[in-house]
Amino acid sequence: MSQQLSSNEICEEQGKLVKALCEAAQGGFKHDLYEKIIAIEIEVEKKLLNRLKSIQTNTFERPDIIWSCCHYKIIQHFRSRFREIHPRHVVEKKKTKKVFFKFLKTCAIFYQTCISELISKFQLDSYRPFFCKWTSSATVSSTISNDEMSSIPEASYSRNHMEALECVYNCFIYLGDMARYSSTCLKKRGAYDRALGFYDLAHRTLPGNGMHRNQIAVVWASDECIVESIYWFSSALCSEDPPKSALLNLLKQLIAFYRRCFAVHFEFVSPMMILLFIISDCCIHSLKEIQPFKCPSIMVKDLENSLLQSNIRNVGYEKKNLYYISSAFSNLLHCRYFNCNDRLRSFYYRFSSWLFHQTLACAKEVESERAPTSYLTSCLPSIKVILARVLESSPAFGFIERNELEQLSYHFRICEKFFKESSENKMLNLFEDYNEFGLCKSFICLFKRLNEDIIGPKLNINPPDYTTHPFSESIKRFYQISKILNLLLS
């Protein structure tokens, strides 16, 4: 209802904006017309900010509706204009870029102001402590005084506070999108990094949502990083609120990769690319788009067998890609679109079993000191797949025997002697991080039932000072996973 009220108030300006954009699309660069468009946009922003500043904490009207009714329309216009301008018309392109940059700057100021206002008015830093750092470092400060702050009641999980969090989340997404558009249209260096930074803030605001994951994947896809983009699109699909565009984006990436494999006659430079190709073939083999490029089924079967007979410690197994691809594989099986794919599920069982025994072998060799500690970085990615499968079939544990799981837990406990102890106590919140570990929703529901806690259980972990260790991220995951295994077997 609140969105409707705000929409009615800006309806007149929206009509003016659409008319001005239509006029701008009909001819070349018109400075006065673009100034009029930006003036309309600023007027809409002022109205929404005034409403935001005047509301009480027991009511809420969302200022982020301006994205769909105003900002996105203008961005789409500029993107089409850049495509239409002839390469020889350098002056027109330069003028259009200048106006577009001015527009993006006003948008960024608006969203930064909205975030600061919402954090202060609704005391959102009591939900997300990192907001304190945002309000102290944001380029636009809040206009709420200390007296007003002291009269605001202590934050609680009310509907209005949650709507405010969602609004802040959307503002971070839009700031990231504008940084991304700035990079693609204006060729500005570092804009992709800024976009990823805003998407990370969105993740820390509402980690269960999927839109920021989809946008991160779009950044990687723009940079032609196929493995990373597929991982993030799959992560978006199995989030609590998967965006509609994530599935289409994922299929586009899989089709593009499949065609690339066809172009090189299905000759692969590493086992990881074989794995990604098999997953792609399972997911899109029936789509008409790939029929002219389709690999014979007997060749796919040979590739599967060669992959599952290889050793995870070979040079061709890039640890980073193993993490991304095995995680994406796990995520896909928990997406509604793919969970009925029998061929994909069948290969997933075989791959998971192979990955489990490879992990167990790595842990044994590290324990017996026949292999360096760095081997742990080879086996850690597989834990994500193993845990997802084990927890999905809990309490029967499915295809992994309990005694095998106990062996893995035992060897991991033995391996702890290779790392320094630390008195610092870290917390792992599974409810917020389950997507990062590839844990399915049924796992969260199980823990909600067992613990009767809407937030989910927090596990104490005592890792070493991994900030200075050469394998810092792997060690951090190692300790987190060890605690999860111990919890499973307790």
Curated annotation (Swiss-Prot):
Taxonomy, superkingdom: Eukaryota
GO biological process, one term: telomere-telomerase complex assembly
GO CC annotation, single: telomerase holoenzyme complex
GO molecular function, one term: enzyme activator activity
Principal subcellular localization: nucleus
Keyword presence, Lyase: no
InterPro entries (UniProt xref): DNA/RNA-bd_Est1-type, Est1-like_N, Est1/Ebs1-like, TPR-like_helical_dom_sf
Keywords of the record: Chromosome, DNA-binding, Nucleus, Telomere
Family: Belongs to the EST1 family.
Role noted for this protein: Directly involved in telomere replication. Associates with telomerase and during its interaction with trt1, telomerase activity is promoted.
Protein name according to UniProt: Telomere elongation protein est1
Organism lineage string: Eukaryota, Fungi, Dikarya, Ascomycota, Taphrinomycotina
Gene name tied to this protein: est1
